[in-house]
Amino acid sequence: MHFYQNVLKFPLTELIKNRDYPGSSHFFFDINNSNLLAFFDFPGLDLGPYAEVLGGLHHLAISVSRDKWAALRANLDAAGVEYMEESGTSLYFRDPDGARLELLADPLGEMYGNQVL
């Protein structure tokens, strides 16, 4: 939770008890543009590190304004996060659990200056 709240500055909007697994929580972060990112914690359940698999999730792209992108890049730098790939509008990196994320500063509906929608 620290990484998403304090490094990426995504507000925690809801924290509820997971009724399917005792002692577990279900929590949601506001990632902009009316989107939420949800996670479960499973204390005591050793699932091992995150692993990319064929057909699985490649990465989660999160669109932010250019100003917010620059501020988040500074936060990532200060936290010592290594980039897998970067350009003037896109950063690929991993969260502390190994999930691949992308921060994208292109306006919604554009990619690298081209209209996509």
Pin down the residues of each PLM region:
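Core segments of cupin and vicinal oxygen chelate
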Residues: M1-L36
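Residue-level "edge-of-site" marker
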Residues: K17-N18, T89-S90, M111
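A short, acidic/glycine-rich surface segment
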Residues: E14-L15, G23, G44-P49, M111
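A short, polar/charged loop-to-alpha-helix boundary motif
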Residues: L108-L117
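Vicinal oxygen chelate
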Residues: L54-R100, P107-L108
